[in-house]
Amino acid sequence: MLLLSVNPPLFIPFIVAGDPSPEVTVDLALALEEAGADLLELGVPYSDPLADGPTIQRAAARALAGNMTLPKAIHLVAEMRKKGVTIPIILFTYYNPVLQLGEESFFALARENGANGVLIPDLPFEESGPLRELGERFDLPLISLVAPTSKQRIERIASVAQGFLYCVSSLGVTGMRETLPESLGDFVSEVKRHSRVPVAVGFGISTPEQVAMLKEVCDGVVIGSALVQKVEQLGERLLAPEEKEAAIAEFAAYARSLAAPLHAPCSLR
């Protein structure tokens, strides 16, 4: 069961499995936990990532060029556990690779290798019932996305939410944004009003200032593109034996700077 403490709010980083290599992905996961991550989203690269912006698309292309697959990504979770990663790990994967592997086989393999949840961004809520049942059976919650929509739809999604609810901060694909919608606070408050599980916000979160603002209204902040871009910038240094340690330390320091506002004292609401 995925039980999350949300005081202070959760820092939920996202990285892509296999970018820049499987081995470095494990090292990055360790660095993120040491930097204060409460939960890790491990993105499974896919050739047609409809929900992802250019930064994560490029990372997926690099990982696919290195022959990363869904089964290999799942086995990376086991490697992370062997190396000492203890925080919950959520597999972020598109539906087609799950279908190819087999839905039940996917949940069984994920559970066997130490994953703690699943997020499938292109799975419509109306079609998610069978996978939610598999999630309950394997104690591997299917995390639901909820975007700005009608109160009735928010209530329906929240009523069956498992693990935590992932609020999409703005419509469109993932990617860093200079500003967040003014209506975001009201949207998150509406979701929290109906939710029995923690409510996290993602898509576009890329600065400590945005994190500081969001900690006042939600239970967790997901940061993806900013961290994936940092991996891209570090590039070959992460793969060079003589530079790898320093590059990972730089990545960890950047992650720590993004998470820092979550652990600062809250202002009065």
UniProtKB/Swiss-Prot annotation:
Superkingdom to which the source organism belongs: Bacteria
Keyword flag Amino-acid biosynthesis: yes
Protein keywords: Amino-acid biosynthesis, Aromatic amino acid biosynthesis, Lyase, Tryptophan biosynthesis
Chain coiled-coil ranges: none
Catalysed transformations (reactions): (1S,2R)-1-C-(indol-3-yl)glycerol 3-phosphate + L-serine = D-glyceraldehyde 3-phosphate + L-tryptophan + H2O
One Pfam short name: Trp_syntA
Self-association state and partner proteins as the record states: Tetramer of two alpha and two beta chains.
UniProt protein name: Tryptophan synthase alpha chain
Protein's organism: Geobacillus stearothermophilus
Gene: trpA
